[in-house]
Amino acid sequence: MSDYTKGDHVEWNSEAGMVRGVIREIHTEDVEFKGRMRRCSTDEPQYEIESDKTGHLAMHKGSALRKID
C-alpha cells in the first residue's frame, strides 16, 4: 500500500544533500525511468518527484522519503 499520495511534499537525501519536492506520480508496475528499469509493485511503489529547486524529476522508494509540511 502507498505511504504517500500525489501532491505530498517530501524530502530525501541525495549526494548533494537534502532535496525537497512534490510527488507527481506513483508507480505500482515496473516502469522505465531515465533509461533504467524500475521495479515497482502495489506493496513497494516508487514515487516520481519533482524537485522544488530545479524542477528535475527523481524516482525513489517510500523508504527513502520523509513527508514534510
Per-range role (PLM):
Residues 3-60, 68:
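Basic/aromatic-rich interaction segments and small domains that mediate binding to polyanionic partners
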